[in-house]
Swiss-Prot record:
Protein family membership: Belongs to the MTUS1 family.
Subunit text: Homodimer. Interacts with AGTR2. Interacts with PTPN6. Associates with microtubules.
Species the sequence originates in: Pongo abelii
Phosphoserine carried by residues: 386, 399, 443, 629, 1203, 1224, 1245, 1255, 1259, 1261, 1264, 1268
Protein name in UniProt: Microtubule-associated tumor suppressor 1 homolog
Superkingdom, natural source: Eukaryota
């Protein structure tokens, strides 16, 4: 699956990682490479258009019939408010896993997706756990460091996917950590002004696995960086929770874990949470905008019974304000279970209370299922985050043998367009016994601050449309800025719809133009597979799809399990047929649902149609895949989104129905299933009122073209809204239900507008209204591009004046004014049929949509957004109630539909089709009329405002003119006075200047005379002093010369004496050394001669001995020869004798050699002894020589020193002589100058007389002789 991001084109972060299959083959994957589908080949695609966009396509189709398509999607949608320094970071990951009976390799997959809500550094972390059974070992460890532009804060994105596979277990762990400081800004697409980041992420996963004992292990690890400061519990408490669910039969479970920091609007900026029960130590978010509540849900179905779910009970506070997202999602899951099991014990001993990550939620499991839970609390402080929570949930389930499930899930959403389209492209011909599916979904919902005191008129959800005001202030309830509606038809087996509402985009640059939405076609064949599958059997088709303006939830019976991918090819052809089926199913399904439920197969398909609104950037309409059979995923995801009700009323309303669902509603609804459905529809109509602008309708009308029809047909159907029923609205709704128990769906439709008006008139239209911009008519096959909603066809651009008009409209809504014409969409919640048959399938009844659009409510404002979420909550409430009522119906009426009913169904279908056509035309007309009226109102308002401003300006300017005239008169008078004063001052100034000049000339003359007299006096004194100084200097010079000569003579004498003494000492020492050396030489010569004589004597002795021995040898030889002659007769004896003689000769030679060597050794020893003695003497003499040399060096140094001193003295003498000569010359010159000066001094002018005294040499030369040379 390839996701294209047309708008946000940022450099892709290329990452290559390796995967190895069971054979040990290692494959390198390039993130840029498109996904490939080949037999016995695995492909992983990492496509990142943005630093936050992370898409991984992991497809494996080994030789064994085992295929995996894993796409991990991370989406961050952020809105920033710089005033409050708060940002909401929402992200969603949905991962669907289906086990197929072909493959037998169980897998453990942990996917961890953090979400951060950042205000005063609180982090939101959502963790998603996925259980899959891949056939290949998969290791993926990318580290992405994302620098956010516009902020110093860095987004540190660490992802670690670690998959270890053997034939029994596979482990897939995704660790994604995003660290944020006070303001988080996604790179490339989030301006600091608060515009949502255009990050796009895609998620795709498919797998075929099956075995007799397939087990799924889901381990979840959550790091909660936000410490919860609770009045009842120690803040920043980390938890490590492990959930383990066992199922011997088909188990359909959904694990949704999100940990969201709830932020209190108090000035302290801390998260405030309350515990409903201090002993349970579970944290209930005390916030008007409920953050996502982490929940781990498991669902099991016995072989004989329908699917059963273990759900979380939401513990309400006394005021019922805090409501958890899990309560919404678990209502539907828990309805059927509550019907059968009110108190289930885990391990057959105790009810399992599963802490949903510091939320007060309990999971109750059927005693058939075993759940083990362990908690490990550890504290980690990172950055400003005070605590870290580690949550580990482990889900183990096994599927029955022979079960085959095909599922492909494609999820694409654009942060700007808020669109998620999903693909479900797998059909299997082999019949499926029971669907086994685990869906892990994390909806990108931001936790928002809770405001205990809501501003007047703003009790609903506040939608932020202005880019400069992206996040809502703390005191104001701020919605999840991005809620994602994901459309995920899941495989052949189950289609689930998750409705997620996104915040409204900015309308700064919106132009008032209605643009038709072009047909969006999927680029990939896999994308085309996403399109809602045609229902092959008409009998089950009525409930095949549920179309709604904001979201179309279609639940198709599992009759087309045998259909191949051929059915997918028929999808485009059968859109119209599906649309008709959707319409007919809405009308007929209420009465005939219980009968049809028995025929339906467990498969439920969800087609999500996101309606186009007049939002500049079409607000997100995303449907998350959920198993329709369980419809728990509906409830959970619905709970996720609508949980963001900011007003306390909305919170109370959400909790009250939750409590009712758990126990009291069971009794009343079992009696009359269809009446309960009608009541729920009516209550939903009461609580679910969507306000759609004309643009929304206009876009919907234009989408009905060619393939666009396929997309827009469901739009005419009811809006799927997340049920967040209001407690205050509840009583009138119940009354209406009583009145309408016996009514048909058409009667319900007729009554619903009245209810809506009643509710709006009661003062709560704002809570019931929903933002038009939050929903967009979006086809399911939108995965073609992440930014597909950005296309002008998808978005309805609104003019800026319309925004201005909406402010007034918002104020009117906030003031609870229900007088304006209101056209609202109401829909009947889908009602899952709980069948007791072996198939055990849920069937969600398609929603009946009602178009009630408020004419003037086009621009996306806070109240409209509030209305959106309240309507969503109301829808979810109805849905949560519907599954139970449907379950009651299925329990009471599991009989097969008779042929008469089928005929009625067909008739109703045709009627519904006709009516839907009329409705679409009316909607189009209303949209056009609304656009025109809105344009007129906007223009009129704009003109009136300009006229008022012009009148005000005219008044102010006239008053200013009067004031300026008076000021001008006063200024003219003052100016004349100033002119007169200036003239007077001018005359006075001139007189003063003349007087000053006269005084100046007089003073100059007096001063000249004075200074000339003083100059002459000083000159005379100076001449006298100069003569005195000259005489003194001459005397000093003579004295210095005499002293210098005497000292010079003394130094020379002493130096000559020292040199002579040194010479004498040197000669004496040298003679002594020579004498000693000669004596030692003579002694050594005497020793040498003596040794030579002794050696000669030894040599002579040895020679004499040698001669004697030779003679003996000769005599012996003669004897031997004689013997030989005698023994010639015996040759052997002769031979032996010869040998003996040769041996003797050899011995003699050797003896001689040994003797010679001994002699040499003796000589050598003697020489060594002598040498040692000589060496000692040499060393002693060398030492003495060295000492003498040292003495000589000293003497030479002294002599050199003396010579240098002598040279210095000579130089000094020369200098002194030169100085003396210079001084004598200067004295002569001075005498001559003085003599000449005396002759002409009385007659010289002041200028000429100063010349003799300016000689520069006089001052510098006089003191120089005083320096002595020494």
């Amino acid at each position: 699956m390839t996701d294209d991001n047309s708008d946000d084109k940022i450099e892709d972060e290329l990452q290559t990682f390796f995967t190895s299959d069971k054979d040990g083959n290692t494959h390198a994957y390039n993130p840029k490479s498109p996904p490939t589908q080949k037999s016995s080949a695995s492909s992983v695609n990492w496509n990142s258009a943005n630093p936050d966009d992370m898409v991984v396509d992991y497809e494996t189709d080994p030789a064994v019939v085992t295929g995996e398509n894993i796409s991990l999607s991370l989406q961050g949608v952020e809105v920033f408010d710089h005033e409050k320094s708060s940002s909401d970071f929402t992200s969603k990951q949905v991962l669907d896993m289906h086990k197929d009976s072909i493959c037998q390799s169980p897998a453990l997959v942990g996917t961890e997706k953090p979400k951060y809500l950042q205000h005063s550094c609180h982090s939101l972390e959502a963790v998603e756990v996925q259980s899959v059974e891949p056939s290949l070992p998969f290791v993926w460890k990318p580290n992405d460091n994302l620098n956010c532009t516009g902020y110093s804060d860095a987004l540190e994105l660490n992802q670690t996917f670690d998959m270890t596979v053997d034939k029994v277990n596979c482990t897939f762990i995704s660790h994604h950590a995003i660290r944020k400081s006070q303001s988080f800004h996604t790179a490339g697409s989030l301006p600091p002004t608060g515009r949502r980041s255009g990050n796009t992420s895609s998620l795709s996963y498919s797998t075929w696995t099956s075995s007799h004992s397939d087990k799924m292990h889901a381990r979840e690890t959550t790091y909660d960086r936000e410490s919860f400061e609770n009045p009842q519990v120690t803040p920043s408490e980390a938890q490590d929770t492990t959930y383990t669910a066992f199922s011997d039969v088909v188990m359909q479970s959904e694990v949704f874990v999100s940990d969201i920091g709830n932020q209190c609007p108090c000035s302290s900026g801390k998260v405030t949470s309350e515990y409903t029960d201090g002993s349970q130590q579970r944290l209930v978010g005390e916030k008007e905008t409920q953050a996502l509540t982490p929940v781990s849900d498991g669902m099991e179905v016995p072989n004989d019974s329908a699917l059963q779910e273990f759900f979380c009970l939401s513990h309400d506070e006394s005021n019922s304000e805090p409501h958890s997202q899990s309560s919404y999602r678990h209502k539907e899951m828990g309805q059927n279970l509550r019907e059968t099991v009110s108190y289930c014990l885990v391990d057959d001993e105790r009810p399992l209370m599963v802490p949903a990550f510091d939320k007060s939620e309990a999971q109750v499991l059927n005693p058939e299922h075993k759940v083990t839970e362990t908690e490990d609390t550890q504290m980690v402080t990172k950055g400003k985050d005070s605590g870290t929570q580690n949550h580990t949930s482990e889900l183990i389930l096994s599927s029955p043998p022979g079960q085959k499930v095909g599922s492909s899930f494609g999820l694409t959403w654009d942060a700007n367009d808020m669109v998620i389209s999903t693909d479900n492209t797998m059909c299997m011909s082999t019949p499926v016994l029971e669907p086994t599916k685990v869906t892990f979904s994390v909806s990108p919902i931001e936790a928002t601050e809770k405001c205990k005191k809501v501003e007047k008129g703003n009790r609903g959800l506040k939608n932020i449309s202005n880019s400069k005001e992206a996040p809502v202030n703390l005191c104001k309830p701020s919605l999840g800025k991005s809620t994602t509606k994901t459309n995920t038809p899941i495989g052949c087996k189950v289609r689930k719809t998750e409705i997620i509402s996104y915040p409204r985009p900015n309308f700064r640059n919106v132009k008032a133009k209605v643009m038709s939405r072009p047909v969006l076609q999927s680029k990939d064949a896999a994308l085309s597979k996403v399109t809602p599958r045609p229902q092959l059997t008409s009998a089950s088709s009525p409930s095949s799809a549920i179309s709604r303006q904001p979201t179309v939830l279609s639940r198709t019976p599992r009759s087309d399990l045998n259909a191949d991918k051929k059915a997918e090819i028929l999808i485009n052809k059968t859109h119209k047929q599906q649309f008709n089926k959707l319409i007919t199913s809405q009308a007929v399904h209420v009465t005939t649902h219980s009968k049809n439920a028995s025929h339906r197969v467990p498969r439920t398909t969800s087609a999500v149609k996101s309606n186009q609104e007049d939002v500049d950037k079409a607000s997100s309409s995303n449907s998350a895949c959920e198993t329709g059979s369980v419809s728990a995923l509906f409830q959970k995801i619905k709970g996720i989104l609508p949980v963001k009700m900011e007003s306390a009323e909305c919170l109370e309303m959400t909790y009250v129905p939750n409590i009712d669902r758990i126990s009291p509603e069971k009794k009343g609804e079992k009696e009359n299933g269809t009446s309960m459905e009608k009541q729920e529809l009516k209550q939903e109509i009461m609580n679910e009122t969507f306000e759609y602008g004309s643009l929304f309708l206009g876009s919907a009308s234009k989408t009905t073209t060619t393939s666009g029809r396929n997309i827009s047909k469901p739009d005419s159907c009811g809006l799927r809204q997340i049920a967040a029923p209001k407690a205050k609205v509840g009583p009138p709704v119940s009354c209406l239900r009583r009145n309408s128990d016996n009514r048909n769906p058409s009667a319900d439709r007729a009554v619903s507008p009245q209810r809506i008006r009643r509710v709006s008139s009661s003062g709560k239209p704002t809570s019931l209204k929903t933002a038009q911009s939050s929903w967009v008519n979006l086809p399911r096959p939108l995965p073609k591009s992440k930014a597909s909603l950005k296309s002008p066809a998808l978005r309805r651009t609104g003019s800026t004046p319309s925004i201005a008009s909406t402010h007034s409209e918002l104020s009117t809504y906030s003031n609870n004014s229900g007088n304006a014409t209101v056209i609202k969409y109401e829909e009947k919640p889908p009602k899952p049929a709980f069948q007791n048959g072996s198939s055990g399938s849920f069937y969600l009844k398609p929603l009946v949509s009602r178009a009630h659009v408020h004419l003037l409510k086009t621009p996306p404002k806070g109240p409209s957004r509030k209305n959106l979420f309240t309507a969503l909550n109301a829808v979810e409430k109805s849905r949560q109630k519907n599954p139970r009522s449907l379950c009651i119906q299925t329990q009471t009426a599991p009989d097969v539909l008779p042929p008469e009913k089928t005929l009625e169904l067909t008739q109703y279908k045709t009627k519904c089709e006709n009516q839907s056509g009329f409705i679409l035309q009316l909607k189009q007309l209303l949209a056009c009329g609304n656009t025109k009226s809105e344009a007129l109102t906007v223009v009129i308002q704009h003109l009136l405002s300009e006229r008022e401003e012009a009148l005000k300006q005219h008044k102010t300017l006239s008053q200013e003119l009067v004031n300026l005239r008076g000021e001008l008169v006063t200024a003219s008078t003052t100016c004349e006075k100033l002119e007169e004063a200036r003239n007077e001052l001018q005359t006075a100034y001139e007189a003063f200047v003349q007087q000053h000049q006269a005084e100046k000339t007089e003073r100059e003359n007096r001063l000249k005379e004075f200074y000339t007299r003083e100059y002459e006096k000083l000159r005379d004194t100076y001449i006298e002093e100069a003569e005195k100084y000259k005489m003194q200097l001459q005397e000093q010079f003579d004295n210095l010369n005499a002293a210098h000569e005497t000292s010079k003579l003394e130094i020379e004498a002493s130096h000559s004496e020292k040199v002579e003494l040194l010479k004498k000492a040197y000669e004496a020492s040298l003679s002594e050394i020579k004498k000693g050396h000669e004596m030692e030489k003579k002694s050594l010569e005497d020793l040498l001669s003596e040794k030579q004589e002794s050696l000669e004597k030894q040599i002579s002795d040895l020679k004499s001995e040698n001669d004697a021995l030779n003679e003996k040898l000769k005599s012996e030889e003669q004897k031997r020869r004689a013997r030989e002659k005698a023994n010639l007769k015996n040759p052997q004896i002769m031979y032996l004798e010869q040998e003996l003689e040769s041996l003797k000769a050899v011995l003699e030679i050797k003896n001689e050699k040994l003797h010679q060597q001994d002699i040499k050794l003796m000589k050598m020893e003697k020489l060594v002894d002598n040498n040692t003695a000589l060496v000692d003497k040499l060393k002693r003499f060398q030492q003495e020589n060295e000492e003498l040399k040292a003495r000589m060096d000293k003497h030479m140094a002294i002599s050199r020193q003396l010579s240098t001193e002598q040279a210095v003295l000579q130089e000094s003498l020369e200098k002194e002589s030169k100085v003396n000569k210079r001084l004598s010359m200067e004295n002569e010159e001075l005498l001559w100058k003085l003599h000449n000066g005396d002759l002409c001094s009385p007659k010289r002018s002041p200028t000429s007389s100063a010349i003799p005294f300016q000689s520069p040499r006089n001052s510098g030369s006089f003191p120089s002789p005083s320096i002595s040379p020494r």
